[in-house]
UniProtKB/Swiss-Prot annotation:
Name under which the protein is recorded: Sulfate adenylyltransferase subunit 2
Organism field: Buchnera aphidicola subsp. Acyrthosiphon pisum (strain APS)
Biological role: With CysN forms the ATP sulfurylase (ATPS) that catalyzes the adenylation of sulfate producing adenosine 5'-phosphosulfate (APS) and diphosphate, the first enzymatic step in sulfur assimilation pathway. APS synthesis involves the formation of a high-energy phosphoric-sulfuric acid anhydride bond driven by GTP hydrolysis by CysN coupled to ATP hydrolysis by CysD.
Protein keywords: ATP-binding, Nucleotide-binding, Nucleotidyltransferase, Transferase
InterPro entries to which the protein is assigned, alphabetical: PAPS_reduct_dom (IPR002500), Rossmann-like_a/b/a_fold (IPR014729), SO4_adenylTrfase_ssu (IPR011784), Sulfate_adenylyltrnsfr_sub2 (IPR050128)
Enzyme class: transferase
NCBIfam families: CysD, PRK05253.1, PRK12563.1
Amino acid sequence: MFKKNTTHLRQLESESIYIMREVMSDFQNPVMLYSIGKDSSVMLHLAKKSFYPGTIPFPLLHIDTGWKFKEMYIFRDHIASTSNIELIVHSHSKGKLLGLNPFENGGSKYTDIMKTEGLKEAINKYNFDAAFGGARRDEEKSRSKERIYSFRDSLHQWDPKKQRPELWWNYNGQINKGENIRVFPLSNWTELDIWQYIFLEKIEIVPLYFAAKRPVLERNGVLTVIDDSRMKIKSNEVIKEKMVRFRTLGCWPLTNAIESEARNVEDIIKETLIVKTSERTGRAIDYDQKSSMEFKKRQGYF
C-alpha cells in the first residue's frame, strides 16, 4: 500500500487520506468534528489534501460549550473565514438555556450534557451517519482499543465487545438507519507524530500550545489559566503570571497548563521527546471516576 522508502509520517498521511476517501464512498452525510486543537488542525489539513483540488465535501462541526479559551474562538473563526468550508456551531439547547457550567454543576455532569449530549443532539439534528474525530490510540487506554471505524448504535452508544474486525485497510461501514460511525483517521498517530507533521507541513495552530506568560491559579497542585472572570477565587488564593503552555485543549476550567519554555514547534518536539506522561493528564474530565473515558465513550462521547 505504501511506496518503497516512504517515511513513517508520509505513511501515516497516506493511511489517513485513504480513510477519509473511504468514508466518502461508504456514507451519505459525513461530518468532521472540529475541536480547534492540534489534532483537529492536522485532520483538517489532511482533509484538504484528500480532496484537492476540490473542496472538502463535508462540513466541520464544533460542539460549543461556551467555555473554550478566547484564543480558541478567535482561531476557529479565523479558520472558518479563510477556508472554503462550512462550519456548523452547535450548543446543547437545554444546557445552554440552564446556564450549565463546570463550577456549579461539576465537570462530569457538565461534560455529559454540554459535550456528549450536545454531540448526540447535533448528529440527530443534521442526520450525520459518520463523524470524523481526532482521537489517537496513544492518548488514553480506552482509545487504544477502539477501532478506526467505531460503530455507534441508535442511541450513539459504543460497546467495545461488539467492535468490528479491521483486517489490513478493510473497514466495515454497514449501518442501519439511525446508527452512525465515528471515524478516527489519526488512530495510529502519536503526539510526537502530530507535532512533527505540523512542523513538516507548516500547519497553523492555536497559540495556546506555545509557552507564554499567562495569569495562572495553582489549586490542588494543578495550574489553571484564568481566561475570564467566571471562576471564583478564594480569599487565600493568588493569581500569578507564569510561563506556561498547553499539551491539550478543552474547556478552560477543566484543562491544566504546564510550565514550559517551548515557544515554537521545534521546542515542543524536543519537549515531547522526553516527556513521560500522556497529554490527557491535563484533562480533568478523564479522572472524575474509574475508567472515566471509557464510560463517557460508551455513553456517546467523542
